[in-house]
Amino acid sequence: MVIADASTKLLGRARWLAWATIVYNMIEAVVAIVAGSAAGSIALIGFGLDSIVEVLSAIVIVWQLNGVSEDRERTALKLIALSFYLLACYVAVQALFDLIGQTKPDTSLVGIGLAIASVIVMPILARAKRHTGKQLGSSTVVADSNQTKLCAYISIILLGGLIFNATIGWWWADPIAALVIAALAINEGRQAWKGETCTDSC
């Protein structure tokens, strides 16, 4: 009885962390896309689009925790994988156009603030998910913690690109950061296509 109660409590915590990630990523996506469009920053826009796909991926995690059928889960993961691939193609092509055309994005203080917030929040969420997943014995929750950790890395890349552009005028740092985000999105898509959210290789 005690073990069952502890397991139920841990499962509830895992669900809460998944929903917290969904809500944060939704806010992150809106702010990033609006700020990116205003500043002409493809890195910020790509970051926002990645956050949207991350929301879909997190919803699959919630489904898994609620015992959704494997067939529905596999279908959802395939669609998420395709979304990551489309995102990567769009961001990569736009970043290359910006590099070739030497399109200089404006400084985005909102974008820098968002990136700093994500660099702080994502590692905290990742650690909490990993700890909960290990206690629960759930590879799904542990894998999701790796996905969240990857989001923190993407946030660091975004922050670097935005700061370099704002402080020393390295306009090309923005599209370069966008290309790195596109490459990471391809990796996320590959993992989702294989039926994973992210593996321990992240």
Predicted segments, located by residue:
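Alpha-helical transmembrane cores and adjacent cytosolic helix/loop segments
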Residues: M1-C202
